[in-house]
Amino acid sequence: MGGNSTELQKILPALEKVVPVLAPGRHKGQAGKIAVIGGCREYTGAPYFAAISALKMGADLAHVFCTSGAATVIKSYSPELIVHPVLHESYDVGEIGEEEISGLKDKVLAEVGKWLQRFDCIVIGPGLGRDPILLDCVAAIIEEAKFKNIPLVLDGDGLFLVTNQPELIIGYPLAILTPNVMEHKRLVAKIVGERDQNVPQNPEVSNEDLPGQLQDLAKRMEGVTILQKGKTDYISDGKTVLSSDYYGSPRRCGGQGDVLSGSTAVFVSWAKEYFSNENAAGKKEVEERVSNNPTMVGALAGSLLCRKSAANAFAQHKRATTTTNIIEYLGHRLFTFMLRFY
């Protein structure tokens, strides 16, 4: 599903129904409030790409929660992002004991927690880094977000965190993981290889049966949706498998995964709102042609949009294509790739 013109003609009229209509009576925030948890001394571009992609797609507000070493840089990229320098890493605090770490984690959770309920979806991982104190704080944020029933999109070092601590995310149906090929292999090794005595410690991932293996992995994760990125993107929640093979761009410039994460977060927030509306038009069509699961709908829509935007950017810029060029096309492709946006 999702590649040839016949399939797209079937899918797009369904996907477009979850996109909120722009109308004079709507107020700021109704088209989506997205948060990105990520950004440290080394990595400032990734959280910016994810957050600005959400805005360019049509979300009303985008927040970034990062370390103090990343905040000023991210703020300088765009005045449209709301940046919170509340995360901490070992470099900031030096050598501290377990009691101090626990207190620091509580402080971070209090700062982030007072904002959480405002968000329609949270992206976790772009530019996060792997500092142990920082990851401990983010693990606590994930638990709090789950308690508040907020959709989560995990990418980059967010995937590193939940691959090593899968109990953080197993059984949470509003979570989307977006692994590339290598990240997917590590997930399979952790979830299947280490937990099932009937399979090898490092089970082989077969390209021939990737959809089936992905569905099995999602099922073992008890309803988590997985968007496995590759030549074809495969998406599964353990119940069914969708695919997105619309040709995008041969350029593999860094940051495209961050664009996908931000875009998917917006679509998930729209889909969740759509399915919660008992009077939403065309709900049966969306359920039959795509899925009744907002994370599946959001992941497929995000994948298709990013592929089309990347294709347009490459057609214009060729080998010079960068992630910034792809972001420029998001809003335009959202308007023209589908049908009803106003």
Swiss-Prot record:
Cross-referenced PROSITE patterns:
YJEF_C_3 (PS51383)
UniProt keyword Nucleotide-binding present: yes
Q: Sorted alphabetically, which keywords does the UniProt record give? A: ATP-binding, Lyase, NAD, NADP, Nucleotide-binding, Phosphoprotein
- GO terms under biological process: metabolite repair; nicotinamide nucleotide metabolic process
Give the coiled coil ranges: none
**Cofactors, names only:** Mg(2+)
Q: What is its EC number?
A: 4.2.1.93
| Binding-site residues, ATP | 229-233, 248-257
Sequence ranges assigned to domain YjeF C-terminal in this UniProt record:
11-337
Name the catalysed reactions: (6S)-NADHX + ATP = ADP + phosphate + NADH + H(+); (6S)-NADPHX + ATP = ADP + phosphate + NADPH + H(+)
User: What is the residue range of the signal peptide feature?
Assistant: none
The record's similarity note reads: Belongs to the NnrD/CARKD family.
Its recorded name reads: ATP-dependent (S)-NAD(P)H-hydrate dehydratase
